[in-house]
C-alpha cells in the first residue's frame, strides 16, 4: 500500500525484561534490519523486582550491559525513557547516559523532548575541543609522533577517533 521496498523498514527491538537484555545478541542477529535497540524502564524494573527511584540506580547494571552488548553488536543503543516528571532529574539522567556512551534516549513525556535534545546535541564548546583534538593529533602524526598533548591529556588514536565521531555526529545533526 505504501510502496516501501522490501526490507526498507528497520526493526527496533525493545529490551524490557532481564531475559531481553541477556538475549540481546540473539534478538539483534535475528534480522539484518535491526540497526538499533531500545532499553525499557518500568517493565525492566518490575521484572528485576527493583524499587524504582528518580536516580535509576537500580537500573545501572542493565543500562551498562545493554550499552556494551549493543556496541559489541554494532547496533545503536537507545537509552530507556525517563518516566518521572521532573525536568532537572531528566537532564541529570540524560547527561549520565551520554557520558556512558549513549547517543540517544527514548522519551515518554513531551516536556522532556527539549531537555533530551539539548543534552544529546554537541555544544559549540565540545565541537571546538573536538576540532582542536583532531587538528593536534593530525599535526603530531604528520611530524612522526604517535600522540599529541591537548590541555594536559595525551591524545592517542581512541580519543582522536571519538573526537572525529563527535564532529560527524554534529554534522549529521546539522549543528557543525
Describe the residue ranges of each PLM region.
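Expand to "…catalyze enediolate/carbanion chemistry for C-C bond making/breaking, isomerization
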Residues: 1-176
Amino acid at each position: 500500500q505504501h510502496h516501501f521496498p522490501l526490507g526498507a523498514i528497520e526493526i527496533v527491538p525493545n529490551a524490557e525484561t532481564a531475559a531481553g537484555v541477556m538475549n540481546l545478541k540473539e534478538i539483534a542477529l535475528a534480522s539484518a534490519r535491526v540497526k538499533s535497540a531500545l532499553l525499557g524502564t518500568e517493565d525492566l524494573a518490575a521484572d528485576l523486582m527493583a524499587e524504582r527511584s528518580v536516580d535509576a540506580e537500580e537500573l545501572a547494571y542493565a543500562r551498562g550491559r545493554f550499552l556494551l552488548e549493543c556496541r559489541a553488536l554494532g547496533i545503536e543503543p537507545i537509552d530507556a525513557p525517563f518516566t518521572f516528571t521532573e525536568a532537572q532529574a531528566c537532564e541529570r539522567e540524560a547527561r549520565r547516559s551520554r557520558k556512558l556512551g549513549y547517543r540517544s534516549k527514548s522519551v515518554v513525556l513531551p516536556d522532556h523532548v527539549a531537555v533530551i535534545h539539548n543534552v544529546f546535541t554537541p555544544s559549540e564548546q565540545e565541537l571546538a575541543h573536538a576540532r582542536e583534538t583532531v587538528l593536534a593529533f593530525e599535526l603530531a602524526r604528520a611530524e612522526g609522533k604517535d600522540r599529541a598533548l591537548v590541555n594536559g591529556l595525551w591524545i592517542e588514536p581512541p580519543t582522536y577517533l571519538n573526537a572525529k565521531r563527535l564532529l560527524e555526529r554534529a554534522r549529521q545533526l546539522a549543528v557543525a
